[in-house]
């Protein structure tokens, strides 16, 4: 039987990320085209709405990831070095990663799994849901902070920095970045987490190759996505009120728009005024969002084989293994540093 001690949550925040969000909101709404920052959508309530949305029957990325993990987790676990620090960059979907953790335990790999998340309460829920008493070889902990906080922690923490590292990027996380920023982000991960032990350290990520507009848009308009999108406006109001402002947004004034961009090969999610120009509340009362003007808040890039090859190459990485299943557009890739 495993340890009865509850897993620890380590606060690795170098600053409170919430404090920067109002400035990011203002900058995005003053830009052209207008945007909203990703952090605005990941309040505790926002994450809960997203989890409900991702469990909808039409949301194929999650279902395909789980199918592949159930079938291939043993082989994935074999590719992770014994003694590794496994950091899950976005831990909301325990129902996915549990298959890999169970395979690591069955292989008697002595690893420590760190769930990283922006939400302390979501981390608490994640850790409470793990049947830790069923694990002897796999240990559990959590990191409260951003991606950047997690990478800095890996690079600077004594003992941790000298162990092999495996970074998990499930949930098509890398698809949320523009193609150039995705390569920069992967390169940043490599420079912080892979270079100390390049032969044993790796990134394990998922990418989606589906460019069928009907399948993609159906997935991203599935049940739960509208509450997820509108929750960001409520969270924004809370943050601006803490700074002495008023309700900047009225969620009733907006609707959610889902589109496929044929040119860029990506899904685009936006919030749009319902029926009139919208003047925002103080302190953004000088900003007007025009009727039908799109305020984009999310993209999901899809990768064909050439785009995937370019992504990994630009990041200075090579895919050493991949896992998928027949009929699935999603695949898992294990990336390592290119040899010098």
UniProtKB/Swiss-Prot annotation:
Domain of life: Eukaryota
UniProt catalytic activity: 4-(3-methylbut-2-enyl)-L-tryptophan + S-adenosyl-L-methionine = 4-(3-methylbut-2-enyl)-L-abrine + S-adenosyl-L-homocysteine + H(+)
Gene Ontology terms: biological process: indole alkaloid biosynthetic process; methylation
Annotated keywords: Alkaloid metabolism, Methyltransferase, S-adenosyl-L-methionine, Transferase
InterPro entries (UniProt xref): EgtD_Methyltrsf_superfamily (IPR051128), MeTrfase_dom (IPR019257), MeTrfase_EgtD-like (IPR017804), SAM-dependent_MTases_sf (IPR029063), SAM_MeTrfase_EasF-type_put (IPR017805)
Top EC category: transferase
Signal sequence interval, chain numbering: none
Record-level Gene Ontology MF annotations: methyltransferase activity
Pathway(s): Alkaloid biosynthesis; ergot alkaloid biosynthesis
EC number: 2.1.1.261
Any Pfam family matching the protein: Methyltransf_33
Protein purpose: 4-dimethylallyltryptophan N-methyltransferase; part of the gene cluster that mediates the biosynthesis of fungal ergot alkaloid. DmaW catalyzes the first step of ergot alkaloid biosynthesis by condensing dimethylallyl diphosphate (DMAP) and tryptophan to form 4-dimethylallyl-L-tryptophan. The second step is catalyzed by the methyltransferase easF that methylates 4-dimethylallyl-L-tryptophan in the presence of S-adenosyl-L-methionine, resulting in the formation of 4-dimethylallyl-L-abrine.
Subunit-structure text: Homodimer.
Entry similarity comment: Belongs to the methyltransferase superfamily.
Alphabetical list of PANTHER family matching this protein: ERGOTHIONEINE BIOSYNTHESIS PROTEIN 1
Name this polypeptide is given: 4-dimethylallyltryptophan N-methyltransferase easF
Species the sequence originates in: Arthroderma benhamiae (strain ATCC MYA-4681 / CBS 112371)
Gene: easF
